[in-house]
Amino acid sequence: LEDKLQDGTLRYGIEKLSGKRTIVFQVSGTIHLNGDLKIKNGDLTIAGQTAPGDGICLAGYPVFLEADNVIVRFMRFRMGNKEDVSADGADAFGGRYHRNIMIDHCSMSWCTDECVSFYQNENFTLQWCLISESLRLGGHTKGPHGYGGIWGGMKASFHHNLLAHHDSRNPRLGPGVNSTKENEIVDMRNNVIYNWCGNSCYGGEAMHVNIVNNFYKPGPATPTGTSKRGRIIAIDKKVSDSDKKSYPAIFDTWGDFFIQGNVVDDGQINGAADYDRCMKATKDNWEYGV
């Protein structure tokens, strides 16, 4: 479980070895990373399910996926907010600009930017993952910043994931800055989104997106008495944000969406108005949930 660049460690198998390989584990526990872990040599499978007991947890630093042909299964990512990690842009697990990637049955939590951000990839799948408890006050220079993730890609699938206890970006759907609307094809279905605060899902500029059969459950942090409680997605396009930051031209293009079968379940504990808002969004996703 030591994080050293020596034979037998996870870092050695990821950073030193190359070619087609599968990393298996003979022990279980937490690997306290000594620095960022960057997956740069592709043709790799990390088989976390081979670890005995409670499996493998990577803690302390971000993990970056920077290679093609990668499978990661049954791993836990707990970045935290160590003082020597820049909080801005630090995701528990993320990657861009690569292809043929599958992330399966993993858990990502306690990030200072987003828990899991994968966009601008090609042939990508994120499935059966638990994405929870981003750090709202984790040291980001913008202040409160507990976000789930940025999702997108060219033929990208996000299904059967749980996003829970994030302020916003549940997820934020984002295109590649150098991409085109024709290439951005994303399928988001059978996910559970629970207890958002500032926003649930939003964005989708210049993307073709399916949002199908997802389950939205407002929680204690979700504002009452507002449209956010019954919101499935806030479709957006941007030229600049509140900080006057300019966006690439692709962000000034409306996306195309197929939205159907999503359920917003509020229960009746927060009063008739909120219950009615969520029931309407479930009955007509487009009219009341967008």
Identify the residue ranges that each predicted region occupies:
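Right-handed parallel beta-helix
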Residues: 43, 48, 68-79, 97-110, ...
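Extracellular beta-strand-rich solenoid/capping regions of secreted or surface-exposed proteins
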Residues: 7-19, 30-47, 54-73, 79-99, ...
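Acidic glycine-/aspartate-rich tracts in secreted/extracellular proteins
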Residues: 2-4, 21, 28-30, 50-53, ...
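A mature extracytoplasmic/lumenal domain signature
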Residues: 2, 27-29, 50, 62, ...
